[in-house]
Regions:
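Conserved alpha-helix/loop element of class I SAM-dependent methyltransferases that forms part
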Residues: 112, 126-148
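A short acidic, Gly/Pro-enriched loop at the edge of an enzyme's catalytic core
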Residues: 208-221
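Conserved class I S-adenosyl-L-methionine
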Residues: 148-158
Length: 344
C-alpha cells in the first residue's frame, strides 16, 4: 500500500512530496514488516560476512602481504584524515565501513565487502561482483567505439569490483583506483593480482583532493555507485577535481541509481529512500534530488557536452539470472543504473 487513499481521506489533499509518502507508509503494517525483515537481512549478511572474514583475518592479511609487499602499485598514506561524513557512518551496516583497520596490514573489511557482497546482490552482479564494471565497458564500447584511453581513474573504487573489468577491457591503459580505506586497497591489489590483472594501481587518497595528480592527467574518470556516499560539499569538490583532471577529448562518467524527478511517483521515491533511513546511507535522499546536470555545469563542464544513458549489469547467464533486464520495478534493488557524465 502506498498510503495515498488514507492520506487523501485524512487531509483532503494529495501528498506533496516523498517525505509525506514515506510517513504515510509507516502506518501500514505490511510495509513495516517488510522493512524490518529487510533491515534484519542486511544485519545478518554483515554478521555472516564478518564472521567468515574475522576468523581468518590474520591469514588473509598474510596472503595479501605476500602478494603486495614492495609493490609500488599499492600507495598508502598513513597520514590521511578520513572525513567525518565517512567516519561517522557504518555504510551498509558494515561495522567500521571501508576504512577501519583492526591491526597493521589488515584487509578484513575488504574481504567482507568482497565475498559477502555477492550474497547481498543475490549473484546479479556476477561471480566476482563485477557486473557493473562490465556494463560500463559495454556502454563505452557501444557509444564511443573509437575511444582509446591510456590513463583511467576510478574514484571510490574500493576493492576494484567495477575497476578491473575496465582495466581488462583496455589492457594498454593504466588504471588507477583511489579510495580512502587502506584495508580495501590492500585487499584490492591482492585480489587484482590473484585474478591476473596487472595494469592497475591502488592509491589511498580522498577524491576531494587529488592534488598528487597534475591537471589533465586522465583520459577517463569513473565513479560507480559512489555519489550517494557523499555529502553535498564532497560531491561538489569531487566534480571540480574530475574537471581539472580530465584531458581534452576525455570522458567523465558517473553510474548511479536514477535521480528523483517529477516523472517518478512519490511512492517510488519513498521506496527508494529506504536506504537513507534504514541502511546507513544518510546522503542517499539528498543526493538523489540534486540536479546533477547543474552540478556538472557548475564544476566547469559545458552543458552541451553532457552524457546521459543507462546500463544493466553483465553477468554469466549460465550461472545467474539476468534479472536486470526484466521490466519489473524493484525500487533500486536490481542491477540497472543511470549514467551521467561529459565528453570534454
Amino acid at each position: 500500500q502506498n498510503g495515498e487513499p488514507e492520506f487523501r481521506k485524512k487531509t483532503g489533499r494529495d501528498m506533496a512530496n516523498r517525505h509525506e509518502a514515506r510517513k504515510a507508509m509507516l502506518g501500514d503494517y505490511a510495509y513495516k514488516f517488510w522493512s524490518a525483515l529487510r533491515r534484519a537481512t542486511m544485519e545478518q549478511r554483515q554478521q555472516a560476512g564478518r564472521w567468515t572474514a574475522l576468523r581468518q583475518s590474520e591469514r588473509l592479511a598474510e596472503i595479501a602481504d605476500k602478494l603486495t609487499r614492495d609493490d609500488d602499485r599499492l600507495q598508502l598514506n598513513p597520514a590521511i584524515k578520513v572525513p567525518r561524513y565517512v567516519s561517522g557512518v557504518d555504510h551498509h551496516c558494515m561495522p567500521g565501513s571501508y576504512h577501519t583497520e583492526y591491526f597493521p596490514g589488515d584487509v578484513t573489511n575488504g574481504a567482507n565487502y568482497d565475498h559477502a557482497g555477492f550474497v547481498t546482490t543475490a549473484g546479479m552482479l556476477g561471480k566476482y561482483t563485477d557486473g557493473g564494471g562490465h556494463a560500463v565497458v559495454n556502454w563505452v564500447k557501444t557509444n564511443l567505439p573509437d575511444f582509446k584511453p591510456k590513463k583511467i581513474l576510478e574514484i571510490g573504487g574500493t576493492v576494484g569490483h567495477s575497476s578491473l573489468p575496465i582495466a581488462q577491457a583496455y589492457p594498454d591503459a593504466e588504471m588507477t583506483i583511489v579510495d580512502l580505506g587502506a584495508p580495501v586497497l590492500r585487499y584490492g591489489l591482492a585480489r587484482a593480482k590473484s585474478l591476473g590483472v596487472d595494469n592497475v594501481r591502488f592509491v589511498q587518497a580522498s577524491g576531494e583532493d587529488l592534488s598528487m595528480f597534475e591537471n589533465e592527467s586522465f583520459d577517463w574518470i569513473q565513479t560507480t555507485m559512489f555519489l550517494h556516499e557523499l555529502s553535498s560539499s564532497a560531491l561538489r569538490n569531487i566534480f571540480n577535481e574530475t574537471r581539472r583532471l580530465v584531458k581534452p577529448g576525455g570522458i567523465v562518467l558517473h553510474v548511479e541509481q536514477p535521480q528523483y524527478t517529477d516523472d517518478m511517483s512519490l511512492y517510488e521515491q519513498a521506496m527508494r529512500d529506504w536506504d537513507a533511513f534504514y541502511n546507513n546511507e544518510p546522503f542517499w535522499s539528498r543526493m538523489h534530488e540534486l540536479d546533477l546536470d547543474t552540478q556538472m555545469e557548475q564544476a566547469g563542464f559545458d552543458r552541451a557536452s553532457l552524457i546521459h544513458g543507462g546500463v544493466t549489469a553483465v553477468v554469466d547467464k549460465d550461472l545467474f539470472p539476468d534479472a536486470a533486464d526484466d521490466d519489473s520495478e524493484d525500487y533500486g534493488r536490481k542491477a540497472a543504473w543511470h549514467v551521467i557524465g561529459a565528453r570534454v
